[in-house]
Amino acid sequence: VGKTLFTTGYSEDNQGAAYADNGEGFIEKKGGFIFENALEMFGAGDDKTLLAMEIARNLPTRRLHIIDAETGLVKQISNINIFVEPAIDPRETKISWPTALKVRGDKLFIPFQKIKNEFDDKGAAVDHGTTDPDEAFVAVFSYPNIGTDPEKIISDNRTSNIGVNGATTGLIEADNGDLYSFSCGAVMAGFSAASTKPSGILRIKNNETEFDSEYFFDVEAATNGGKLFSLDYAGGNKAIARILTNDSGNKWEAFGRTVFNQKL
């Protein structure tokens, strides 16, 4: 974030730290913080603010940390409900898996996938599946005064859920302020079941909080069946995309090294 490098632990390591150039050519620790569950989604409020989110697999509430990049200290922690659809059996309850934290102006956009609140008899979370893969979802919150619940949730059925597990760029911002989302929907990227909708890109215009009904980039049509696996903004209204050339492997296999079917 800005000129600050953040590091965070995972699993049993619940500590984070901020580092920066001390002005004498050396990297120096500026501060640190702790968290309860692993931080698995990140974004920037601005050049001086890190957003980091705890995403417990068996809890519906998401814990958002707002961290000062200049001190490395937590300024605010908010418990938010991105999406919850209760069920009589708690294991059938649908909750959110966020795939980006994107601030634009006075809004925080959080694209998400719907997953089941599944856990085993010992209370441990199990591998989750995408329960509604044929639609894109974004929760829109106020910012920086973040409420417990989103102002609204927008959706689009022209493509699949936005983003993939482990990536933080489900939404990117162009120079003119327009936001672009990427949808994958591939089994090899962790979707279960696979989406029947084409992998593609949607747009939310600057100063708008709805998907642009006049814009849709069909990635599968443009790449002879390829699916977006990542999308990173490169400046000048251009982005670098990583494409899965096919989706013939097993679940999560795109993250491994046994099959290589990716191209830029």
Give the location of each predicted region.
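Intrinsically disordered, low-complexity segments enriched in Gly and acidic/Ser/Thr residues
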Residues: 212-264
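Loop-centered beta-sheet repeat module
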Residues: 128-202
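Short, conserved, GDST-rich strand-edge loop motifs in beta-rich repeat architectures
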Residues: 53-57, 111-135, 181-198, 242-262
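Repeated scaffold domains used in trafficking and secretory/extracellular systems
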Residues: 1, 34-47, 86-101, 161-171, ...
